[in-house]
């Protein structure tokens, strides 16, 4: 399938010692590849277990080019409800592992961020238990932060929000 962020190649390359379920290979956060291109890379680089290589056949996406806008027909996750969240995910995922919520437990997952430890922002939300997040970070606690749901499409990895939140947090020892 096409990549909804297929025009963007940006961000740090994952270091091998930090691989996990959400980051398995040494590629940039925003890699710009289709699933087929990524599969070919995995196969060609022998990244499968024991350097296994497959007899891989990839059906090309007809009339597709990387500069085309593509909207996923099915949500990839309950926490990525729309094109805006999908576009912002690569920039907001850096809040994972911090004390800042990315909106799980709200209607604007990966379109907002906030924390009870922030104060110099004019947006607030209170995460609650829902289908996509039974126990969201800061459940039932008022979070102060920023609403990004109406900003223009991001065309690069955007670290401004992470830096703003870190700068504003009242206790930097609990940020990361």
Where are the predicted features?
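A short acidic, often aromatic-flanked loop/helix-cap motif at beta-alpha or helix-coil junctions
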Residues: 4, 64-67, 155
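Conserved anion/nucleotide-ligand pocket segment
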Residues: 18-92
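Conserved active-site and cofactor/substrate-binding residues in soluble primary-metabolism enzymes
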Residues: 33, 37, 107, 157
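ATP/pyrophosphate-binding catalytic subdomain of soluble kinases
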Residues: 62-133, 139
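Conserved functional hotspot residues or short segments at active or partner-binding sites
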Residues: 108-176
